[in-house]
UniProtKB/Swiss-Prot annotation:
Residues 55-163 form the sHSP domain. The gene is hspC1. SUPFAM superfamilies: HSP20-like chaperones. InterPro entries: A-crystallin/Hsp20_dom, HSP20-like_chaperone, Small_HSP. CDD domains: ACD_sHsps-like (cd06464). This is Small heat shock protein C1. The keyword Transmembrane helix does not apply. Belongs to the small heat shock protein (HSP20) family.
Length: 163
């Protein structure tokens, strides 16, 4: 049953995104809200069944900010409970990959407990990011990624005649 929780959770997130969209009128949202409420109540019941061990459901996504300044972009993410060894920041082309994973297998009092907490973000970088100077730091559960900006030369443009 636990392997279906992320899929169910993704459905809830999709429903919330659809509800927030301006393209939907209020009347058409009623079925989506009903489905989201049903799924939410079932997950709450499952959580009670497992003695409130499904804490990952409560913290659905990480809080993050993207800040634009004159000389740099700054990504700030709240990643409570993660340490440096559990977070990877990789650059591949013009994409920045940020991933975190915690696995905790605990055997105590004749019961097996297992906890897995993870996140994955992919960010497409602007042309003016100095990819060689990107840095990251983790302090007090806050991951800060600094993306220095460089001046990008405008490409020469010319008009092409049509024959």
């Amino acid at each position: 049953m636990l392997k279906y929780i992320p899929a169910i959770f993704a459905i809830i997130l999709s429903s919330n995104i659809a509800i927030a969209s301006k393209n939907y009128d209020y009347i058409s949202l009623t079925p989506l809200r009903h489905v989201a409420d049903l799924i939410d109540s079932h997950i709450t019941n499952i959580d009670h069944l497992f003695n409130n061990r499904l804490t990952f459901y409560e913290s659905s996504s990480l809080k993050s900010k993207f800040i634009t300044k004159d000389k740099q972009y700054i990504i700030v993410m709240e990643v409570p409970g993660f340490d440096k060894s559990q977070i990877k920041v990789k650059l591949n082309g013009k994409k920045l990959f940020i991933a975190g994973n915690i696995e905790d297998k605990n055997k105590a009092n004749d019961s097996d407990n297992y906890m897995n907490k993870n996140f994955n973000y992919v960010i497409s970088l602007y042309e003016d990011v100095d990819q060689k100077s990107i840095s990251a730091r983790l302090k007090n559960g806050i991951l800060t990624i600094i993306l220095p900006r460089i001046e990008v030369k405008e490409q020469d443009s010319r008009e092409i005649t049509i024959n």
